[in-house]
Amino acid sequence: MGSINRAGIAGDLKTMRIHIAVLLTMFLAPLSAIADPEFFDEGPMAGKGYPFSESVRVGNILFISGQVGVDENNELVEGGITGETRQIISNIGGALARRGLGFSDVVKCTVFLADVAEWGEFNTIYTSYFEPPYPARSALGANGLALGARLEVECVAAYPSD
């Protein structure tokens, strides 16, 4: 077995500390430059008295509130998981378009399913709108979704760098 070179370890630790300091500066500096949030209340659920905004922009990030399969009359669409999924993705597309973005700008989605067994049906429709590279995504079972919906989807999108 070889011996431990303590001078080499000390040098590696010093280099590692410098790298950590540089990384912290890179990640923490932008936090101080974050813009004030902009709140947008548009889309099919706007003006209905719900206690949330359709979307919120902070800097170059757009947060889209959870969407359920409601149409412009605030009615849950028919067709179960298939009809609701298509309506939700249409609603998300509208929220993105109103802010000058598209599906390719989405970086994260969270999917809440009343019945996880319907994940496959949802996924088939989802992949017809989102293309590789796909956004990061979580999917989980949820009991008691708003308006008796089969699913709810929220997304985060990023504005392209200038």
Positions of PLM-derived features:
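Proteins with a high burden of low-complexity, intrinsically disordered sequence enriched in S/T/G/P/A and R
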Residues: 5-6, 99
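Residue-identity detector for glycine
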Residues: 2, 8-11
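Positively charged n-region of N-terminal signal peptides that target proteins for export
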Residues: 14-19
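N-terminal presequence-like segments and the immediate start of the first folded domain
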Residues: 20-27, 31-90, 94-108, 113-162
